[in-house]
Amino acid sequence: EQSDHDIRIKAHVNQIGDVEAPEVSFEEMCEHAEDNEVRCGHPETAARMRELIDEYQEAGDSIGGSIAFEVRGVPRGLGAPRFDSFPSRLGQAMFSIPATTHVEFGLGADARTVTGSERNEDWTFDEGDNPETESEAGDPVPVGNDHGGLQGGITTGQPIWGEATWHAPTSIPKEQRTADWETGEIVEDAQVIGRHDPVLPPR
């Protein structure tokens, strides 16, 4: 999607269960994500995801998954170092979506193996020829973007990228064991009747 401020947002389903798509570019997400039911930017993986979803649906069960997202055109300098940081505000919005269990920016959890010197990344001066960034020629910019366009809670002008994960829908037709609050008895064959989504990320 594109806003009035030329901010471009795109996401695609990058994993369903144990079926994971290879990394795809922003352009590939734009080109392929809406071409299939699961909204995966990698067509071959999308077909495998569809098969897996069908398996769980036929069994009356469900499965979790995740999306990869990228935002371009966000001006640098938005956010704050602490309570009003850009990632905390964006994370709050994403965690407001039911069933969200994990949100990460840049390297995310992989940052646990990165040293402080690596995390700092090298800096240089923008030559003014990179359409992906919102900086101008002569501006100081990081050479890489492992931090996901965010440093110290503030936007850098580079693409903001990361992932969000949703657990499997828990309202499923498969019979399960539960406890009846009113009778105080164990129910061995509880079943949820109604419409059931076998997976959430494509939505």
Predicted regions and their residues:
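Well-ordered alpha/beta subsegment
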Residues: E1, P202-R203
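Glycine-rich, mobile lid/loop segments that gate access to catalytic sites or pores
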Residues: E1-R82
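Short, mixed-charge aromatic SLiMs
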Residues: Q15-V24, G116-E118, G184-D189
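Structured, active/binding-site neighborhoods that engage oxygen-rich ligands
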Residues: I16, A168-P169, I193
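Glycine-rich anion/phosphate-binding loop at the beta-strand->alpha-helix junction
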Residues: A59-V187
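Amphipathic, heptad-repeat alpha-helical segments used for oligomerization and assembly
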Residues: E182-P202
